[in-house]
Amino acid sequence: MADVKKVVLAYSGGLDTSVILKWLQDTYNCEVVTFTADLGQGEEVEPARAKAQALGVKEIYIDDLREEFVRDFVYPMFRANTIYEGEYLLGTSIARPLIAKRLIEIANETGADAISHGATGKGNDQVRFELGAYALKPGVKVIAPWREWDLLSREKLMDYAEKHAIPIERHGKKKSPYSMDANLLHISYEGGVLEDTWTEHEEDMWRWTKSPEAAPDTPTYIELTYQAGDIVAIDGKAMTPAQVLAELNRIGGENGIGRLDIVENRYVGMKSRGCYETPGGTIMLKAHRAIESITLDREVAHLKDELMPKYASLIYNGFWWSPERLMLQQMIDASQANVNGVVRLKLYKGNVIVTGRKSDDSLFDANIATFEEDGGAYNQQDAAGFIKLNALRMRIAAGKGRKLI
């Protein structure tokens, strides 16, 4: 890629991407534009500006994407009750298509002919970033330094930084032993002692949540208001999508909700252990299923459940911008037209317990479902014909002597 003149770098301001910035300048003799996304990771993003300026960067983008992230990515995903391999709420996966989108937008705005990222050659993120980039700008060049250079250890990165006067602190506050990624939906932990699947995670690793043992001894009740499948208010107070998720993170974290320790199957072929804190997302998943339980038609609900694992895999594997994901999203969104109402939850020591749900669009009819006298709302004699018709094929097979036991 000797013809690269300008590169947009997804830049955090940390060691890896600061080294990448200088490496791009030296290796490709190109201009670098930095892009730093505020996705609600809870850290200051402005220091990235000073670091980029110190390395001679002239065009610096620092964007607050919190509302767009939750509104256009997290909320649509939760309309599908999305969960990967039965446990993972896709906190890292769902952030990558937005970052890829913004990288391409900035490349178009600045006339850059390439983008670059700090994802390693072992992980899923390289796939997610690049699939998104190619979908949105087919001819874009992608530079992935971890697949090119020989700086394959933290010590080598530190040595490179010192040699090139990159402003990175070698000493100071103790560095976390984990590789972490955070946004408004979750925080993840990988590496360190977690690479031994038998070793228990350390209590002081967790940053967002209290342990269930340390959570309050009295439950917290909340009410979530839904419109078209999305939460629009907490306890009657209207909030934006990002405000909703931030508040649910706070409440859930206080009550020890949302911790997860799993081994997942990466798209690149290996198994990887990760620990996650997703307090708000854990509450959202439980509540959304509760409001759907009274507002969705049975067959629509079952079809959504059948398609959800495919939808989850598309997001996990980086196919957010694919035609099949977009097609599924249209179906999912259409199913949410009547998913309106209020869900009441009890939060207690790591548990999310549904205690009530109500909706003007509810399909629950107490007159039909009652165990008491229903006044003829449901004719129980109709069940006999229903059962016989459903048994017909099995009765025919049995009549032909087919043995079942």
UniProtKB/Swiss-Prot annotation:
The keyword Isomerase does not apply. It comes from the Bacteria. ATP binds at A10, Y11, S12, G13, G14, L15, D16, T17, S18, A37, G118. Its EC number is 6.3.4.5. It catalyses: L-citrulline + L-aspartate + ATP = 2-(N(omega)-L-arginino)succinate + AMP + diphosphate + H(+). The keyword Membrane does not apply. L-aspartate binds at T120, N124, D125. GO terms for molecular function: argininosuccinate synthase activity; ATP binding. One of its GO terms (cellular component) is cytoplasm. It is an enzyme of class 6 (ligase). L-citrulline binds at Y88, S93, N124, R128, S179, S188, E264, Y276. It is found in: Cytoplasm. Keywords: Amino-acid biosynthesis, Arginine biosynthesis, ATP-binding, Cytoplasm, Ligase, Nucleotide-binding. Coiled coil: none annotated. Pfam families: Arginosuc_syn_C (PF20979), Arginosuc_synth (PF00764). One of its GO terms (biological process) is urea cycle. Its main location: cytoplasm. Pathway: Amino-acid biosynthesis; L-arginine biosynthesis; L-arginine from L-ornithine and carbamoyl phosphate: step 2/3. Transmembrane segments: none annotated. InterPro entries: Arginosuc_syn_C (IPR048268), Arginosuc_syn_N (IPR048267), Arginosuc_synth (IPR001518), Arginosuc_synth_CS (IPR018223), Arginosuc_synth_type_1_subfam (IPR023434), AS_cat/multimer_dom_body (IPR024074), Rossmann-like_a/b/a_fold (IPR014729). Belongs to the argininosuccinate synthase family. Type 1 subfamily. This is Argininosuccinate synthase. It comes from Ectopseudomonas mendocina (strain ymp) (Pseudomonas mendocina). The lineage of its organism: Bacteria, Pseudomonadati, Pseudomonadota, Gammaproteobacteria, Pseudomonadales.
